């Protein structure tokens, strides 16, 4: 942009591997390309959930460790997929893989990277008030200290991604 600072200089994209987070990734890539923004992508292995499952005796310790390793590998694959999508459009991406409580890790990254915008996929369907307190996308939305863009409409985003 001529004569003005880029309002989206640092974009953080949160992905969880859902179809809506892939749609959000396509949008984040297109926006980053259009504005020359730095794009960082974060995936968080929810080890809090794993600990709860261990405590509820759904897992034994060895199963928890195996499942956690599987989730880390899955996170790496998803991050690498986003990198490939970005490379197709000439956008450089920095990936971040964390373990912890999802909304806290995303919020921590927003602060540490001083991001201008957080992008995430469409929120999951909330069937009860209780669900709204536990849906990670909702918790992220409430916790972070920067503007948040929720991406919807896969067909429109696909066209936008293809056009850049």
Predicted features along the sequence, with ranges:
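Small/aliphatic-rich secondary-structure junction motif
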Residues: 3-61, 143
């Amino acid at each position: 942009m001529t004569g003005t600072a880029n309002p989206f200089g640092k974009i953080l994209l949160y992905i969880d591997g859902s179809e809506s987070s892939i749609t959000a990734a396509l949008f984040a890539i297109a926006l980053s390309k259009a504005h020359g923004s730095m794009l960082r992508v974060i995936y968080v292995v929810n080890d809090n959930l794993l600990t709860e499952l261990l405590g509820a005796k759904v897992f034994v310790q060895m199963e928890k460790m195996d499942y956690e390793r599987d989730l880390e590998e899955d996170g790496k694959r998803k991050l690498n997929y986003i990198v490939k999508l970005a490379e197709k459009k000439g956008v450089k991406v920095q990936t971040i893989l964390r373990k912890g409580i999802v909304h806290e890790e995303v919020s921590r990254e927003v602060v540490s990277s001083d991001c201008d915008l957080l992008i995430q996929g469409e929120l999951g369907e909330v069937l009860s008030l209780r669900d709204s307190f536990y849906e990670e996308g909702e918790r992220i939305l409430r916790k972070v200290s920067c503007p948040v863009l929720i991406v919807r409409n896969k067909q429109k985003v696909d066209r936008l991604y293809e056009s850049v």
